Amino acid sequence: MAAVRVFCVLLVVATIAARRTAGGAPATSDTGDQALPAVTAPPESAHLDPFYKKYIEADGFPIVASAGVSDYALREAAYLAHMMLANRPDVRRAMVQSGSRLCIMAHNEFTTDLPEFAWLAKQKEQDFPDLAAKDYWDARARGCGGDEEHAHCSCGEENLLGYEGDPYAAENILIHEFAHNIHLRGVVRIDTTFDPRLKEAFKQAMAAGLWKGKYASVNHHEYFAEGVQSWFDNNRENDHDHNHVNTRAELIEYDPALADFCREVFGDTQLTYTKPVTRLKDHLSGYDPAQAPKFVWPERLHEAKRQIRRHAEARGRVKADQPATGAPAKGT
């Protein structure tokens, strides 16, 4: 978009087997679960909006939610955040120092309901002149990653816990959005060469015809976040936003430069995704999927969803017809 650049998905907890981290120590599911504190009320020191009633930390990284969000969603989010940055406490510290936090939407809450993203309700998207800004953003995003100016990221509880009706059931939104936050609130504060190097890799990938017409071709930020999803074996494949690449092995073969950036940031820690229903133990012990609510798009957003999907499909058709020289990135 032109005036507003908060990275949101258009549209992933993990079973962690014992792996070797970049430092040689095993990263295990037990390690992740033992690191999780209890869900509590937000501490006064967090200075949160009264909207938030629940709070947890992943190694000091704050995760917040309203009273309507399941405690299990907060614990799952903390688990994933802990494991993704198992090798990079320095990046996590930089994110926290920048003011970053993760905000979880209840299944019946939407992006502009969150205090950190309420301002989007007044930010008209120029490609959708017939849509109210609030409807556009509420239909467009079940997760946002933040950027250099906006510290916060978000995701929906229905995706974290695998509720019926989850519109993005084939992937984990937290992994994508947290990747943006790791990039733009963490890594770039530690290594000022990272973003210029990533931009150059993106430019070369576009010149080589990689990711043509797919979401990874939108800009270098989405290029990285989509790569991170595949690095953790968690992406959709073969639809209007994705090609066949959805695993680490496929990413290494298809775009080794992007894989190298993922390795640089995350090392060899691996998340092997399975739905919560397959692993009701440890931090999910006691969770009963049969009692979970269903996610339903409200009627007020149906037209916005139709227009957004048509736009995404048209983007894919146009870019697929363009020469493999790249095009100006249009960020979201």
Where are these regions (language model features)?
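Pan-zinc metallopeptidase signature
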Residues: V228-T332
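N-terminal mature-domain "stem" immediately C-terminal to a signal peptide or N-terminal signal-anchor/transmembrane
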Residues: P26-Y79
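Bacterial N-terminal signal peptides
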Residues: F7-T15
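An amphipathic alpha-helical core segment
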Residues: F194-L251
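Bacterial Sec-dependent signal peptides at the C-terminal "C-region" and cleavage site
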Residues: T15-T31
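Bacterial N-terminal signal peptides that target proteins for export
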Residues: M1-F7
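Acidic/His-rich structured neighborhood in mature extracellular/periplasmic domains
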Residues: F51, A58-F61, V69-G209, D241-H244
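Ser/Thr/Asn(+Pro)-rich, low-complexity disordered segments
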Residues: H47-L48, K54-Y55, L198-A201, H311, ...
